[in-house]
């Protein structure tokens, strides 16, 4: 295991806290929490990082890969500083998500699963986020849900994030 790919003591402490919620013989139950913590530190989940998580939790690497590749919240390659995920499922699409997604693509100059040349933004297409009544819904960095995202609100968000990103 390459030392630069291991997690910080702070991240390991967070994983240990998640593991403690489960019976001692079920450390693997904390795999989603461990992957999230690893991704928060590294920005994405390299194979080496997933291998480390598997070893730390005492589970086969393939089981970690299955979880990481199944859920859209995990980044399998480097992403921009701001990952914007827009729901394009039918309820959101019926409330303007398709138009909002096209506006995002045009405003950022990229398509889905692409990152801007400056490394600031990555655009993703996401599954239902459970806020259909507030569509179109956008998720920023898997943490902040933004609702009723009109083209005007999208432009405002992009401007704000560009300003923050330049700091």
Predicted regions and their residues:
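Signature of N-terminal electron-transfer/Fe-S-associated modules in redox systems
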Residues: 1-167
